[in-house]
């Protein structure tokens, strides 16, 4: 639903100088201590850091695309889990870098903070999370080979653990039309805890990058299986297609995506948005293709523009009565999926991790462009404006009802136990770091759980009624649900804008359900609630899933507990099946107090799974929760059929 106006290529202003030689490479500091402290440069040496190496090299290629010189990027996972990233950009410069007295290619791969993005003429805008790129990948790789096609010649150079192993060499010629860079590297097993790349993790990030870089084609190839696996991401519609993708499984309230684009304050702004029938807002913000999960000035500008523009239109067109209050930003954003993407020459971020944009001009630019173009859109599309207004008014009424219920909850003090749910068996300690709460499904397990707990540090909250599916409910229904009210009050943090992590009463929230399909469904309902209204609990590592055993094997008066069919078979092999008495637990209620305490509750002997969430995963998580908990049956069926092969024990 783009706004019609004269065609103009706004990207032209942001394309860099065509001069891209050694003099455009600036050196800010030497490559030091990367191998000693890799976490400082790539976040961690876990599987997350492993994948970050790929992103660093890909981001360099994307910078070429943003500058207008690259159309294709191919990422290949080889059989040995080495990676090749190839682009058709200008090719990294190979001539002499005067200050360093060595080739620019060597400088890029051996000097930290060396690259065309720091001088201003090589790149107008660039991404890359830490701006360290190629040199850090080189330092953390057991080998790295780079091939450059440039000016009719092919050059190669090789490295190992940051050191040159083969000097730059011209190995042949290419046509003038052939150009680009190919980087092949193998992460160093001495550095990384994991060495195996996950296709789906790379797929999610590369798809996002393709959405954000209109017309860039990114191909992901996996050579590790007998049958080659390939996926290509190419989106002519850019972020408009991103919004449609994120709205999969939801009912859009109007057919086309609203799109605003323009340039102001030397900042290129793109915004795409569409309302759906859900009750949560999903807004994702990016600066030079970098995800800014904490928002910042570009998000503030958008929210200001949306709220003021919509209220002004609603007043002028009598969609709101004079006696009615203005719609709040939250009301207007209910069910909104939105992508905000800005391109800035020298973005200022708050904090080291670039999670929040601080550039003040971005607020002015986004606010101005969205205000002007959204006003025009609403005037041209009164039917869509009416649909948006009706949804916002419904949200306003629901929020008012929810506020009354919330105020009742707020008046009760969690500190002295007043107002805590009557069914909560609380612990005596007030030290939140030592305390944990078990959310227990059903009455049958409640007795053993209460008796088997440590009453000093372990609380038990039973779920007796049905947990509301919050994916399909407004705030007023959420506050009216007894089970959810009980959890909100017991946890102590509040939800949404009231959330305060410092008031958390238990540092471990443990969801304890039966190990069957019904138990998994109840656990998913609870996780859906926490994810939507208290996501910080997951981000900060406070949410866990208990792992009750499936089997109790007794032989020679000794008990063995198996938590999976595979473990059950291994135990039988080890102790011998003859004379072994096997019982399968169908639910928590079938265990006696001692069994439940030993296998599922005692910190010394239990197994817990911590629920993790990375900010990079949020868009995919939103889609997964919508698929599993939304109204549409067909996407859910497709998801289960597609993922059933990854499930070892499918209880149907």
Predicted segments with their positions:
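Conserved short strand/loop->alpha-helix "switch" segment adjacent to the catalytic nucleotide/phosphoryl-transfer site
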Residues: 36-55
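C-terminal interaction appendages of subunits in large macromolecular complexes
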Residues: 397-416, 431-437, 447, 451-453, ...
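Short Gly/aromatic-enriched secondary-structure transition segments
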Residues: 98-99, 453
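A short glycine-centered beta->alpha linker in the GHKL/HATPase_c
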Residues: 91-96
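Short adenine-binding "F-helix/F-box" segment of the Bergerat
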Residues: 97-98, 105
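GHKL-family ATPase ATP-binding module
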Residues: 1-24, 31, 53-55, 63-65, ...
């Amino acid at each position: 639903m783009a706004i019609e106006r004269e065609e103009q290529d706004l990207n032209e202003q942001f394309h860099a100088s065509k001069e891209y030689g050694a003099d455009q490479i600036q050196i800010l500091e030497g490559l030091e201590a990367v191998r000693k402290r890799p976490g400082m440069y790539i976040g961690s040496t876990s599987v997350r850091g492993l994948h970050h190496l790929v992103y660093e090299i890909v981001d360099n290629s994307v910078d070429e695309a943003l500058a207008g010189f690259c159309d294709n990027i191919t990422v290949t996972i080889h059989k040995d889990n080495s990676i090749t990233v190839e682009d058709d950009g200008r090719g990294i410069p190979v001539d002499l870098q005067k200050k360093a007295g060595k080739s620019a290619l060597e400088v890029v791969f051996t000097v930290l903070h060396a690259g065309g993005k720091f001088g201003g003429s090589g790149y107008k805008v660039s991404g890359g999370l830490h701006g360290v790129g190629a040199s850090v990948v080189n330092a953390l790789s057991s080998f790295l080979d780079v091939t450059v096609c440039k000016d009719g010649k092919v050059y190669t150079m090789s490295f190992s653990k940051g050191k040159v192993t083969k000097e730059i060499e011209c190995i042949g010629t290419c046509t003038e039309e052939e150009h680009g860079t190919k980087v092949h590297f193998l992460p160093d097993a001495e550095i990384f805890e994991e060495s195996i790349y996950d296709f789906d993790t790379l797929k999610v990030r590369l798809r996002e990058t393709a959405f954000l870089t209109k017309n860039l084609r990114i191909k992901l190839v996996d050579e590790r299986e007998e049958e080659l696996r390939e996926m290509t991401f190419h989106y002519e519609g850019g972020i408009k297609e991103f919004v449609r993708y994120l709205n999969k499984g939801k009912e859009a309230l109007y057919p086309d995506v609203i799109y605003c684009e323009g340039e102001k304050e030397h900042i290129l702004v793109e915004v795409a948005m569409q309302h759906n029938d859900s009750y949560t807002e999903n807004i994702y913000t990016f600066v030079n293709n970098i995800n800014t999960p904490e928002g910042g000035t570009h998000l503030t500008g958008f929210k200001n523009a949306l709220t003021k523009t919509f209220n002004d239109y609603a007043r002028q067109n009598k969609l709101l009565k004079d006696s009615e209050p203005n719609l709040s930003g939250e009301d207007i954003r209910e069910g909104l999926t939105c992508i905000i993407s800005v391109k800035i020459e020298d973005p200022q971020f708050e904090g080291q991790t670039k999670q929040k944009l601080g550039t003040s001009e971005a607020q002015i630019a986004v606010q101005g462009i969205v205000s002007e173009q959204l006003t025009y859109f609403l005037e041209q599309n009164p039917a869509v404006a009416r649909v948006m207004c009706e949804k916002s008014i419904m949200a306003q009424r629901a929020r008012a009802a929810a506020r009354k219920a919330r105020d009742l909850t707020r008046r009760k003090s969690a500190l002295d136990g007043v107002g805590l749910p009557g069914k909560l068996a609380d612990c005596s300690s007030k030290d939140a770091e030592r305390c944990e709460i078990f959310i227990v499904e059903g009455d049958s397990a409640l007795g053993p759980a209460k008796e088997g707990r440590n009453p000093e540090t372990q609380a038990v909250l039973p779920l007796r009624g049905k947990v509301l599916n919050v994916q399909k409910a407004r705030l007023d229904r959420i506050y009216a649900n007894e089970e959810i009210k009980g959890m909100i009050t017991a946890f102590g943090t509040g939800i949404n804008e009231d959330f305060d992590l410092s008031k958390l009463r238990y540092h471990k929230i443990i969801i304890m359900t039966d190990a069957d399909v019904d138990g998994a469904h109840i656990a998913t309902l609870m996780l859906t609630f926490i994810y939507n209204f208290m996501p910080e609990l997951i981000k900060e590592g406070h949410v866990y899933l208990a792992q009750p055993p499936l089997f109790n094997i007794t032989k020679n008066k000794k008990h063995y507990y198996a938590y999976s069919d595979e473990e059950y078979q291994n135990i039988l092999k080890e102790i011998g099946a003859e004379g072994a008495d096997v019982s399968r637990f169908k639910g928590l209620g079938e265990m006696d107090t001692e069994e439940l305490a030993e296998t599922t509750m005692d910190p010394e002997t239990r197994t817990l799974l911590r629920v993790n969430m990375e900010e990079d995963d949020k868009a995919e998580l939103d889609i997964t929760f919508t698929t599993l908990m939304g109204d549409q049956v067909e996407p859910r069926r497709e998801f289960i059929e597609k993922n059933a092969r990854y499930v070892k024990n499918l209880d149907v």
